[in-house]
């Protein structure tokens, strides 16, 4: 019997890149900075800089708060598509 589930390894590099790419797109579209986003999302102007720097660590709960903040902000700026 073969194992039907395949696990894709998600690395630290992957999660760093995913957030930074998303943050860059948001910052450009909304003419804002990583510092301003960090303050608004998690009360830390340096958070995204730490995520961006592979030599520095970050808290996964803070990472999740940042993702949730981006989710909420993106919903606010999306054009009305629901009908």
Question: Where does each model-flagged region fall?
Answer:
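A short, Lys/Arg-rich alpha-helix, primarily the initiator
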Residues: 2-27
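Histidine kinase transmitter module recognition
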Residues: 26-29, 54
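Short alpha-helical DNA-recognition segment
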Residues: 31-47
